Amino acid sequence: MLNKLSRLLDEAGISLTDHQKNHLVAYVGMLDKWNKAYNLTSVRDPAEMIVRHILDSIVVAPYLQGQRFIDVGTGPGLPGIPLAIVLPDAHFTLLDSLGKRVRFLRQVQHELKLENITPVQSRVEAYPSEPPFDGVISRAFASLSDMVSWCRHLPGDKGRFYALKGQLPEDEIASLPNNFSVESVEKLRVPQLEGERHLVIIKSNKV
């Protein structure tokens, strides 16, 4: 598994320490183990998890600005845990409403000794935003309009929304509320992953 991850990282042009690689592989091992009982992801093959969960998450890292992020609807910690492993100086709040997912996140935090994540069981609308976050991240969480509507209280004035999408969601972009605009759209390259991947970065047009 470690060799596969190393090959994919080389192909993607991503440089990580051995410690970070080992942590990512250990996380996949835990996800595979817990998935059998908790049904945390539809991906059953650990080798496929490396591509569809690990690489697909960490390719976003170069685009994140700031230190404090919240991953809304994180599920089993995606993309928050892989990002926390590769960005040790940033902090990630991992938010999910399902208790079984948050229990898994806390176990990952304990076993991998990740000090830069905070798993939280809560609905996003009910979660307080003090202090504000630099970035709100989502992967397969909601439409862009729903994301900014439900999470508008979370980022600071200069905070951004980072939405991981497959094909470019042109209809969703066109439907954004007037007080939000797309700052940039980044086409992501994920080795061995079929289909397109995009990162949509949204800012609030606060006066």
Curated annotation (Swiss-Prot):
Location within or outside the cell: Cytoplasm
EC number: 2.1.1.170
Broad class of the protein's primary localization: cytoplasm
Catalytic activity: guanosine(527) in 16S rRNA + S-adenosyl-L-methionine = N(7)-methylguanosine(527) in 16S rRNA + S-adenosyl-L-homocysteine
Binding site for S-adenosyl-L-methionine: G73, L78, V124, E125, R139
Gene Ontology cellular component terms for the protein in this record: cytosol
InterPro entries (UniProt xref): rRNA_ssu_MeTfrase_G, SAM-dependent_MTases_sf
Origin: domain of life: Bacteria
Enzyme class name: transferase
Keywords: Cytoplasm, Methyltransferase, rRNA processing, S-adenosyl-L-methionine, Transferase
GO molecular function: rRNA (guanine-N7-)-methyltransferase activity
Family of the protein in this entry: Belongs to the methyltransferase superfamily. RNA methyltransferase RsmG family.
PANTHER family: S-ADENOSYL-L-METHIONINE-DEPENDENT METHYLTRANSFERASES SUPERFAMILY PROTEIN
Primary role: Specifically methylates the N7 position of guanine in position 527 of 16S rRNA.
UniProt xrefs under HAMAP family: 16SrRNA_methyltr_G (MF_00074)
Protein name, as recorded: Ribosomal RNA small subunit methyltransferase G
Classification of source organism: Bacteria, Pseudomonadati, Pseudomonadota, Gammaproteobacteria, Enterobacterales
